[in-house]
Amino acid sequence: MLAADDIGEVPAAPCCPESGDETKNTDVKSDVNTAAPAGSEQLSQGGSDDALLSYVSAFIEKEVGSDLKSLKTLGKLIEQMTESKVKLEEQVLTISSEIPKRIQSALKDAEESKQLLDEFLEQEAPLFSSISSHLLMAQPWMDDLGAMITQMEEIERHLAYLKWVSQTEELSDNIQQYLMTNSVPEAASLLVTMTELDIQLQESSCTHLLSFMRATVKFWHKILKDKLTSDFEEVLAQLHWPFTSHTQSQTVGGSRPAGTPELYSSLDTLFCQLLKLQASDELLTEPKQLPEKYCLPASPPVTLPIQVMLAPLQKRFRYHFRGSRQTNVMSKPEWYLAQVLMWIGNHTQFLDEKIQPILDKVGSAVNARLEFSRGLVMLILEKLASDIPCLLYDDSLFCHLVDEVLLFERELHTVHGYPSTFASCMHILSEETCFQRWLTVERKFALQKMDSMLSSEAAWVSQYKDISDVDEMKVPDCAEVFMTLLLVITDRYKNLPTASRKLQFLELQKDLVDDFRIRLTQVMKEETRAALGFRYCAILNAVNYISAVLADWADNVFFLQLQQAALEVFAENNVLSKLQLGQLASMESSVFDDMINLLERLKLDMLTRQVDHVFREVKDSAKLYKKERWLSLPSQSEQAVMSLSSSACPLLLTLRDRLLQLEQQLCFSLFRIFWQMLAEKLDLYIYQEIILANHFNEGGAAQLQFDMTRNLFPLFSHYCKRPENYFKHVKEACIILNLNIGSALLLKDVLQSVSEHIPATAALNEVGVYKLAQQDVEILLNLRTNWPNTGK
């Protein structure tokens, strides 16, 4: 750096004179500003005097006002104003003494800051010049140093490169030496190390190094794999692997012939050594995969020693079920499916007892039996992927294939514990083309089944008609078979891997239910003239049964899960309103609600037809009873024994016969709705058409009550404990008509005395009337003819 004397004088900063002038200008401006208020004050003095006078006048008016007595407070007011004046003057003096000091202090601080800034500006110019010259002198050194650093980094990369090559060659030499001394376990361990180095180099851009490393790993992996595989196959051959029967598996696992301990020890050793080659095998071997359209779940390759164990079975499978072999028949998928299941079953015990302990010992999470099953299932998937395109347009062959695959899947999962997360045949059936064909075939055969079940002679007969305990629902055979069909369809698709595919099958089921409902409606319309006939009742029982089963299914876990899946799909596609989505989410509705509502509507319509039919018959048989001479019947005291009105017999006989008939033909829940609906209509009919249409003397009222309470109501006592509760109009009308004279007069007076705003509810309740309104009771009282003569 240069000395301070060499720098010379620093020219004055251009900002200093500008600062001095600015100070002077500020002083001038302050003088002007100080003078300005004085002038303005003089100009506005006249206005301010007026304002002051107004303020004082308002203040005195507020404090004193027009009351002369308040003048006494002027002294106190003057004292308060004087004190306020003194305080204000003190504040003004205090402020006027402090402000100049503050201004002086601020000016002093500003001056000091200005001086410091001037000093910094004087030092800045020589420092800038010194630094610039220093950087200029150092630039050649920096360029030389940068070149040296670049050269050193290049040398370090070369050294690292050579280190990787050297390490790889050293590992390769050691593997060779171990193999020459037949130390295979040590060689396998070194190959694992080399594989780890290869994996570490995956992100490197040194393509030649990567190729060299990969070629070296591949070279030794092939040698070790071939040797270990050969030795392992030899041991397996001595164990008679693969087993052709379950008995052979038990024999190998249970008996201990000569040399067995050494044999199993070799099996253990070779299995572990092959496991060590798993990483390098996955690195070098491209996994064989089916096309992406099958959407198989991601899964690691089958463990290497299990691959060796699977090899002879894979060879047999391809020999028998590929090409032109007689065993490779499109119409017999059950042959290869059953063969795979048999192989899994034959080897399960050996895998669990001999192989699984080896995997557990080395800390592997692999399940030997499931890994073995997974390898065999992949053979099935490859076979299905190649066969299905040839079967798509042959309905019988395709349907047979699907049936056999579903049976295979069921046994695979239930008997052999195959997890649903693994690749399975359902993934192949879920492929778009195959799945749509499956839906089409499923619909076709379901409709054919519906046609046959409805045209059957036993379609409307319950198969449990002779077993009273079982036949509570009185379900006709066609409805039973139809719901069994739906249940079978559910079992067929419930293991599909995706919710979207399940929802498509659910839509198929709903379409089938709707189709069956339409068919039932068509048959029902043909039977409308015989609404009480056997077939009409069977249709009604079928509708009720299907609705009840669907409501029960709606609470099933499987369909609740589908409901949640449907909710997510509908929310994404904006198919439903917010209210409908909310009902689905809160489980207020179900996936079958639309179908259940349609069935319930049909059920109610059919029941209404039956009730109307019976009611018409009852009305026809009640014509004589309507014309009964209620006004002139003898009183109860004039009769030895009360008996049923002869004109009521046709009415009650018709009612009894129809109730018995429908009780036998309808299921319990439907019959309960039927008789309650009929009772409601009958109650209103008797009340409106018989009671309100006539006048009653004492004998007539007693006879009506006897007919109702001792004959009509007991007809319904078989179905409930208190049948009179379903005939409230009739029951209460009989009460009013049969009140003794005193009670009737008293009630009449009470009803006449109360106003509209004060109903006579208490008085009516006291005599047992709860249903009828006050006006109805007044009408009934006027229908009585046995009032005392008051002389009016």
UniProtKB/Swiss-Prot annotation:
InterPro entries: EXOC6PINT-1/Sec15/Tip20_C_dom2, RINT1_Tip20
Keyword flag Transmembrane: no
GO biological process: endoplasmic reticulum to Golgi vesicle-mediated transport; mitotic G2 DNA damage checkpoint signaling; protein transport; regulation of ER to Golgi vesicle-mediated transport; retrograde vesicle-mediated transport, Golgi to endoplasmic reticulum
Keywords: Cell cycle, Coiled coil, Cytoplasm, Endoplasmic reticulum, ER-Golgi transport, Membrane, Protein transport, Transport
Subcellular location: Cytoplasm; Endoplasmic reticulum membrane
Classification via Pfam families: RINT1_TIP1
Region (Disordered): 1-47
Topology of this chain in the membrane: Peripheral membrane protein
GO cellular component entries: Dsl1/NZR complex; endoplasmic reticulum; endoplasmic reticulum membrane
Ranges of Basic and acidic residues composition bias in the record: 21-30
Coiled coil (UniProt feature): 71-123
Positions of the RINT1/TIP20 domain: 220-792
Functional summary from the UniProt entry: Involved in regulation of membrane traffic between the Golgi and the endoplasmic reticulum; the function is proposed to depend on its association in the NRZ complex which is believed to play a role in SNARE assembly at the ER. May play a role in cell cycle checkpoint control. Essential for telomere length control.
Family the UniProt entry places it in: Belongs to the RINT1 family.
Subunit text: Component of the NRZ complex composed of NBAS, ZW10 and RINT1/TIP20L; NRZ associates with SNAREs STX18, USE1L, BNIP1/SEC20L and SEC22B (the assembly has been described as syntaxin 18 complex). Interacts directly with BNIP1/SEC20L and ZW10. Interacts with RAD50 during late S and G2/M phases. Interacts with RBL2, preferentially with the active, hypophosphorylated form.
Protein name (Swiss-Prot/TrEMBL): RAD50-interacting protein 1
Organism: Mus musculus
